[in-house]
Amino acid sequence: MNFKAITVCLLLVISVSGLSQTDQSINQTDKEGKKQGHWIKKYPNGNIMYDGYFVNDKPSGEFKRYYEEKPLKSVLVFSKDGTEAIATLYYPNGLVASTGKYVNQLKEGKWRFFSIMANDILISEAEYSKDKKNGLVAKYYQDGKAAEKLFYKNDLKHGECVKYYPDGTLTLRTNYINGNLNGKFEAFFENGRPEILGQYKDNLRDGPWLIYKKDGSLKFKTEYSAGVPDNSKIDIYQSDYLDSLERNKVRIADPEKTGEIW
């Protein structure tokens, strides 16, 4: 066998040995069955599902997950004990969807959500405690102006809620207690004049409700008691009109998320 043939054979042996060692160094468990070291899991189609490291069955350091069709889904940087992770989640188009922190796989602290249409356009911020909204939740228009500010307690609306037109003018101000409308309900035209003034009690209209025209003149007045108009002869149009006005007040949809990452 000449020198060239020997060299080729040695290279082949080294190459195969290297591949074998690489395969053997990933997806390993210890004698107790706990994941240790570098792990790569794949979808049935062969694409990578996740790529990361484990210490005693808990993720450690940088951990990447992918959508089935290859785009990056999330990057999580775990603490040494694997209980906390700084997360960046992505839309399938590659743009950042949200950033925040997980503690024991639950959202904790401030989370920021971004537009699926353009890079670095903040559309919402929310405070979380054990995966539940607690504190201020703010939503924004594409230009960064405030669209809505409201407070949550244990994942329920609780406290003042204000909404704005795109130019920053106040469009709605109301109040919630444990997820139910309670207290004043005030809606405004773009010119700042009141459109609806009323009161809620346990999610039901209560007391006098005043509906105004854009010029400031009164359109009609209706009295409610536990959600029912006191005047049995009330024009159905008035009640329907009031319902329609409330439905059509500015609403900002909850930001889309990239889905389950665990």
Regions found by a protein language model. Give the residues of each.
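Bacterial Sec-dependent N-terminal signal peptides
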Residues: 1-26
